[in-house]
Amino acid sequence: MVLVDTSVWIEVFRRPARLSLEQHVAFDDVVTCLPVVQEVVQGFRDEAAYGRARRAMLALPVVDSPMREEVFLYAADLYRAGRRAGLTIRSGVDCLIAASAIRHQLDVLHYDRDYDAIAKISSLRSRRLKLH
């Protein structure tokens, strides 16, 4: 199973799309978490596109819903571990997404350097996309 990060969904929903998700992961293996849903849908200005994206995201299996206190605390631990290791993790939300992925033993498919840093200090299974 693969948790697809916001950085990938942005490229999928972009018009014209810069990538096809199916080239990188079987759609039946895709899951999400609510922080990804929020990040994806909050970026839409057009109401019709927002509605389509919202329906698409909420049709996916959702892990860690509702998110429990220990997920947030683990995310904080990841952020702090990165700082101790001299790594810059720019987004606390990425730590939250990574914490959820680690807890459920999911790969994270992304185009975001934060996950590369988190993978260096944790058991995160990071799968970075290369966009052309």
Question: Where on the chain are the PLM-derived regions?
Answer:
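Histidine- and aromatic-rich ligand-binding microenvironments
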Residues: 4-5, 33, 90-91, 128-132
